[in-house]
């Protein structure tokens, strides 16, 4: 390879120059005049003739040294020197024609001096250009070393041309002992590098500049644990900050989940103190999730609004580092409510597709289920003078297949029993039992709903299961209530309950067997609804009753407004003029009395 050949040539020249130097140091230098025939010498010889002669006269031994170094610097010198003796012309010509010749290694002392002074500056760039052209053809493994050497060479070239006192045996031969570095460039810059690299210092002026930024932390993520804690404590001068952080870290340590690292967000330490203050001011983590207040929290923390997952990141970091502390100190929520809020937030997009009639669980608004704008209590016409008992239907729950599930919750007994003093106390007991059963069934349904929400089932399946379970519980409670009433009252009760999928209505028919004080009632809750009631009132009149349709004897009749047949009854004239008879009230979706 070319590089190896150049290195071997340089080594040979150094050895020969050293031998010649030892031999010439014993001979005194002759300063004869230069013959005019040496016109083919290097054109740079006439640049400094006076200074060259002065230096040659003063420092003969040092000139010989420079000659050796100059011979290494340009092996292909075109001609001799004016200072050489006349007899050395033939030797120069012979040396120039010899292949593999080391160059000007055997020239006279005068020639050596001029060669050094005149051609060091001119030939050195040529030699470097040749070396750079050779390096371009080398392998990639050697290119890395060459690149480093080129940087060193450029730095050395910035020191200026070699001066008279910059060369010596201590500079030449120590470089000889390092051949792998000697093949780059000529010997002069290598000699300079051996002396001046440790001196002035900037062997790699750009290297220090590149290393310095790496020592500086690029962002807060490279900080150590102690630095992060220090930054967290020193974010502002609020005296409550240190107190809060000490209390937080102590609590987490006692809890068994010590804070081993400080969360980083947007390349800065996440301010746990301000995050806790902002969230608790909004009502706690559950309220922030439900009301979607994360944008305000982000602005309060002075975080960039361009963060795409700011809400998720803040929520997870708060849950990890601050939520246990919030539950312990403030008690704004509990983990079950937090999980329900997270699940609700995830289902929000899909929940809108079910419509507004979809059942939604609300711990504080469970009684809202017991009202229905479709079936007002006044339309049933069952309110009596004493207790105003009524049947309050709950809203229909829409399942996946859009089938309506009627759920009837008896808030009170469906029939006024004020006209039966014998069974009034028993009726009150049955009413209390019915209310307790309804409350218990509602609580059980809500508890099961909470469990369903915390499970991993799809929202549609959860809603269907909740609806089925609540319907089953309510139907069972209704049947038990009516059966208990049948055991106490002299009535015959028939309960028709069909499956919800059949879309048929449930009817409750009560037929009294009490003789003159008989009760005939028919109630149909869902679908087309109607009811007929005819019974005698006590002597005291009530203004809530409808006007009497009969004469002074007080009589009334009820007919089915829906065309399904009616129950008709008459009461005797025991009441006299003061007695009033409650007429039947027919109610339907299409017609009202």
From Swiss-Prot:
UniProt GO molecular function: chromatin binding; DNA binding; identical protein binding; transcription coregulator activity
Modification Phosphoserine, positions: 77, 81, 88, 101, 119, 353, 362
Region (Acidic): 119-156
Positions where Phosphothreonine occurs in the chain: 98
Induction: By p53/TP53 following DNA damage.
Classification via SMART domains: ARID, BRIGHT
Comp. bias (Acidic residues): 128-158
Summary of the tissues where the protein is detected: Widely expressed, with highest expression in skeletal muscle, thalamus, and colon.
Quaternary structure and partners: Homodimer. Heterodimer with ARID3B. Interacts with E2F1. Interacts with GTF2I and BTK.
Protein's recorded name: AT-rich interactive domain-containing protein 3A
Organism: Homo sapiens (Human)
